Structure formats: structure tokens, C-alpha cells
Amino acid sequence: MHTKDQIFAAPIARLGDFCFDEQVVDVFPDMIQRSVPGYSNIISAIGMMAARYAQPQSRLYDLGCSLGAATQAMRRHLTQPGCHITAVDLSHPMIERARAHLSGFKSEVPVALVEADICDIAIENASVVVLNFTLQFVDPEKRMALIQRIFDGLRPGGILILSEKFRFEDEPVNDLLIELHLDFKRANGYSELEISQKRNALENVMRTDSLETHRSRLQSAGFVHQDLWFQCFNFGSMIAIKSSDAN
């Protein structure tokens, strides 16, 4: 049974920026399920895509791994020999809780948990890279360099799975999808106070891009084959494949 997210249930006089501290880590599974539509579907599909695209003797990266849900999904599906997973998160409480969580599952696939800024991590010999609702927390000026480094570190035929909250350039559509997401949170038991306070806490730390911006960035990095494979309201996931003839 997960601890219920009540972080923003009472009025907070001095509301600071949202951060992945011990308090958030304690309620994160409940928070993510009640806040991100389609999250479980995305996690399941990450495992299936890893099974299809992982290459023998390669590395798989979970960048911004939080509690290791995507890491465990990949590990559970892998059958290729010699694969290693590197799971990275900047939050010390997240990494420690992920370590405890992953240790509860038996697997022959080794996982290296790394506490670091994903912008400082070398991507090498990769067949699968996952950015699952992570890029939106990266400094916008650093995003292109990160995507380029991922492309360069992927083997030909490797994939990037990029899940994000999207901003839409058509204003009426964007407004509608925002409202539908708020309805989703209300239906999951969040009060207007909780929704408002969390939105304000996230304002300075989570900056979303449009689908067009993501597509352009991926194209510029060298991903010729890329598109949206999942969407629910203003949340979704993209897949980008490095051509088998790419260097």
C-alpha cells in the first residue's frame, strides 16, 4: 500500500519550488499515478520496447530514474546477453529508495545506480535510453546538448524513449487538454488547493516544450525516425530510432 500524497493538502504559507526530497519520495508512487495519465501504460511499454531494441553486450540508460520503475520494467523484459542498465537521478533520497526497491527483485541484469546530474553522464555503447518525464526538469538551454549526446552514444538501431508533459501551440487545444488533466487530478481525489499549490511549486522548475520543439530537437540531433507513440491529454511519449546506417 502506497503512502497517500497529501503534501499540498494544507495551506503552505511560504511555498518554495518543487523538489524531489524525502517528503516527495515517500509519496511518489501515489503522486505519479494520480497526477500523470497513462503512466502505468508507458512503464509497461518501456519494458516491451527494451525487449525489442536492446542489443547484446550493450548498455541501457534510465536518465532521471526516480524510484526505478522504468529500470525494473526493462530489467524484467531483457533476454539479450551481456546487457547492463545505468539508472541516474540527481536526488539522493530517490537513488537510495530506488536501491531498496530494486533489491527486492531477483534479476541477472546488473543495474548501476548513479547519483548525478544527467547532463554530466557519459552515454556509451547504448541500445536503449529512457527519459521518462525528465527532460522537462532540465534547463532548456541544456536540452539540445543532452539529446545530441544521447544520439551520439547510441548504437545504430538504438532507441530513445522520451516521455513528457507537452505544451500545444494551438491555444484552444492546449487550454482544453490542461483542463482535462485538471479533471483527471480532481477525479483522483486532489482538491483545488492541492492542485493550485503544486502548480505554483512547479512553475519555476518544470518547463514544458511543444511537440514541434521536441521533433525539431530530435531531428537536429540526427534522429531521422521519430514520432509520438502514446498520448493521454497533454502527457505523452515519443520514440526516436537511430538509423542502422548512422555512424
From Swiss-Prot:
Which Pfam family, any one of them, does this sequence belong to?
Methyltransf_25
Q: Which GO terms describe its molecular function?
A: carboxyl- or carbamoyltransferase activity; S-adenosyl-L-methionine binding
Q: Which reaction does it catalyse?
A: prephenate + S-adenosyl-L-methionine = carboxy-S-adenosyl-L-methionine + 3-phenylpyruvate + H2O
* GO biological process per UniProt: tRNA wobble uridine modification
E.C. designation(s): 2.1.3.-
What EC class does the entry list? transferase
Q: Which residues bind S-adenosyl-L-methionine?
A: Y39, G64, C65, S66, D117, I118, N132, R199
What SUPFAM superfamilies does the record tag this protein with? S-adenosyl-L-methionine-dependent methyltransferases
Q: Which InterPro entries match?
A: CmoA (IPR005271), Methyltransf_25 (IPR041698), SAM-dependent_MTases_sf (IPR029063)
Keywords for the protein's UniProt record, in alphabetical order: S-adenosyl-L-methionine, Transferase
Q: Which family does it belong to?
A: Belongs to the class I-like SAM-binding methyltransferase superfamily. Cx-SAM synthase family.
Q: What does this protein do?
A: Catalyzes the conversion of S-adenosyl-L-methionine (SAM) to carboxy-S-adenosyl-L-methionine (Cx-SAM).
Relate the assembly described in the record.
Homodimer.
Q: What is this protein called?
A: Carboxy-S-adenosyl-L-methionine synthase
What is the organism of origin for this protein? Answer: Aeromonas salmonicida (strain A449)
